[in-house]
């Protein structure tokens, strides 16, 4: 059992016998009212999304999920096929099932992902916390105002845009933190 105040993005709870993924959780406490947790939830079986407000003391059922290591095998249209690294079983997911990690999934990636199963059905895929990607396009370095942390826009091979340090050039390999939508960490070593 979890309480409402323990909810955070990535937590899975059971509502009406279905697993629901917490995509966003915002804790609010006002002086007059009790503390509340505003959440955005996604049904892992149907893809339906909703917003629910919980009291900090509400009791919620945990969901036990199975996890296996998998790698991206290939992409066909909006279907992403992942392969279990131990028994080589293939699993398919639609783009909408993995929309939170989609900006960092690209053909030919070698990252070992975590395939998430609910009752023997693949419902989601989680990327490692840090991934390495190649910068496909970025502007040249800015001259002059270089005191402090200077950032500029860059584009990855799959079209994802993010801000990188000013010294990063086209073709450089960068590290990306995949939590909370992904952010530049530094040049890959």
Swiss-Prot record:
<dbReference type="GO" id="GO:0003746">
    <property type="term" value="F:translation elongation factor activity"/>
</dbReference>
<dbReference type="InterPro" id="IPR012340">
    <property type="entry name" value="NA-bd_OB-fold"/>
</dbReference>
<comment type="function">
    <text>Involved in peptide bond synthesis. Stimulates efficient translation and peptide-bond synthesis on native or reconstituted 70S ribosomes in vitro. Probably functions indirectly by altering the affinity of the ribosome for aminoacyl-tRNA, thus increasing their reactivity as acceptors for peptidyl transferase.</text>
</comment>
<dbReference type="InterPro" id="IPR008991">
    <property type="entry name" value="Translation_prot_SH3-like_sf"/>
</dbReference>
<dbReference type="Pfam" id="PF01132">
    <property type="entry name" value="EFP"/>
</dbReference>
<dbReference type="InterPro" id="IPR020599">
    <property type="entry name" value="Transl_elong_fac_P/YeiP"/>
</dbReference>
<dbReference type="GO" id="GO:0043043">
    <property type="term" value="P:peptide biosynthetic process"/>
</dbReference>
<protein>
    <recommendedName>
        <fullName>Elongation factor P</fullName>
    </recommendedName>
</protein>
<dbReference type="InterPro" id="IPR011768">
    <property type="entry name" value="Transl_elongation_fac_P"/>
</dbReference>
<dbReference type="InterPro" id="IPR015365">
    <property type="entry name" value="Elong-fact-P_C"/>
</dbReference>
<dbReference type="InterPro" id="IPR013185">
    <property type="entry name" value="Transl_elong_KOW-like"/>
</dbReference>
<dbReference type="Pfam" id="PF08207">
    <property type="entry name" value="EFP_N"/>
</dbReference>
<keyword id="KW-0963">Cytoplasm</keyword>
<comment type="similarity">
    <text>Belongs to the elongation factor P family.</text>
</comment>
<keyword id="KW-0251">Elongation factor</keyword>
<dbReference type="Pfam" id="PF09285">
    <property type="entry name" value="Elong-fact-P_C"/>
</dbReference>
<keyword id="KW-0648">Protein biosynthesis</keyword>
<dbReference type="InterPro" id="IPR014722">
    <property type="entry name" value="Rib_uL2_dom2"/>
</dbReference>
<dbReference type="InterPro" id="IPR001059">
    <property type="entry name" value="Transl_elong_P/YeiP_cen"/>
</dbReference>
<dbReference type="GO" id="GO:0005737">
    <property type="term" value="C:cytoplasm"/>
</dbReference>
<comment type="pathway">
    <text>Protein biosynthesis; polypeptide chain elongation.</text>
</comment>
């Amino acid at each position: 059992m979890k309480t409402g105040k323990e909810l955070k993005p990535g937590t899975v709870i059971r509502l009406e016998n279905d697993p629901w993924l917490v995509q966003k959780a915002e804790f609010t406490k006002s002086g007059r009212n009790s503390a509340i947790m505003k959440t955005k939830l996604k049904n892992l079986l149907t893809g339906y999304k909703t917003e629910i407000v919980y009291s900090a003391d509400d009791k919620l059922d945990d969901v036990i999920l199975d996890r296996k290591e998998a790698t991206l095998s290939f992409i066909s249209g909006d279907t992403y096929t992942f392969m279990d690294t131990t028994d080589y079983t293939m699993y398919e997911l639609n783009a909408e099932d993995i929309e939170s990690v989609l900006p960092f999934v690209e053909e030919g990636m070698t990252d070992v992902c975590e395939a998430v199963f609910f009752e023997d059905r693949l419902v989601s895929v989680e990327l490692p916390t840090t991934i390495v990607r190649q910068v496909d396009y970025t502007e040249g370095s800015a001259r002059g105002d270089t005191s402090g942390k200077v950032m500029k826009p860059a584009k990855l091979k799959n079209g994802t845009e993010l801000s990188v340090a000013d010294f990063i050039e086209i073709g450089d390999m960068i590290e990306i933190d995949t939590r909370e939508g992904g952010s530049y960490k530094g040049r890959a070593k």
